[in-house]
Amino acid sequence: MNRDNELVHEAWLNLKTGDRELARRYAERALLIVDDFETKVKAYYILSQATDNPKEKRDHLETVLAYDPAHAEARRELAILDGKLKPADIVNADSLPAQSTDPQQAKANRFTCPQCGARRVFAPDGKSLLCENCGYGDQFTVEGAANESDFFIAMATAKGHRKPVATQVFHCNGCGAEFVLAAGVISSTCAYCDSPHVVRLDESRDLLEPDGIIPHALTLKQAIEKLVSWVESHGIRPEKKVDQPRPVYLPIWTFDLGGSINYSGERIELDEPEGFGWNRKPRTMRFVRVNEQYPILVNDRAIPASKKNTAILNRLLPTFDMSAAKPYDTRYLANWPAEIYDITMSDASLEARVQVVRQYTDRMRLEITNVENMRLSSAGMTVESFKLVLLPVWLTEIQSNGELIHVLINGQNGRVV
């Protein structure tokens, strides 16, 4: 064991036994002679744990993250210092408490006309709620773009690992009826008075509320026109009457990823020939061991948040303009059914990492041509932030040639897959 590693080891032992002053001294001595990256990270983290001074602790934690942006413990401690994460909310993802399967009382927003009391629905102009009875409409605007949330903070709490399992009991403020919906539904109409309701997810402690939404921009008539045009252009002959497209908001996760992909292997180096004439030595080839990093930066990697229609939704995702996502507002869901996620954010983030590694692997093998036996590691990759976004989709099925074809229409621009 190197001298600096011995000092760090002693620092850890003293920190664990409660002698923080001695731990600090060992860590500081290690930093005086340290010559490798890993030991610096360990020493500075020990220093952050050996002090109660908030400024000193912050300085040490920020130094750790400057060396290693993916250092989970340092990010957690810094989030606690910043007040973004409460120690009581931190969970062990491997031993989460069981979720209740009992029906839960759900609070919901109800949209009625202030003039006649009839129900109001969101209009596909993306700007207004319209009364179905008297036509009264009022416009609303939601400024800005959908906000991103800190991935690490969500992962440290139960919200990053939860998915809905319990049913939801709605109490309709219109007629007083109570009715039950499955946990995967975020909006619906009252089964008795037909009044639209939208779940207030901020009341559901272990679920993440959507960060953004791309509003529906097509009417039913426009969706039918897009469907007919697509069927005709693909030469599809339906065997029976095709059901009208059904509108829905489908959830997706988007992730911003950074950091680096670490790669190792053997680089081929050629030595220049030496001497002249008969004494000239031929060029020789040798292999040099390399351990290097390839920087990555990925914005808005989209992953389905629902297990339904995942394969076909993956084909539809590239047709959306994600930059058009608005901050989530329950009024967008008035009379438009929506699903909440049943794929947790933690599971979706793993799929995002797999996709990014696959994407960069192809690029790296094309760009780094002088390294043999290349091996890759995603340990240096970090998921920086995420959004839960609701996408507008029209759904239907077509029976043709003995096959059931699932059709999805992009509710933003009419693209069909």
Positions of PLM-derived features:
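Residue-level recognition of tetratricopeptide repeat
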Residues: 3, 37-40, 71
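Charged, low-complexity helical/coil segments in non-catalytic cytosolic or luminal regions
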Residues: 160, 164, 205-404
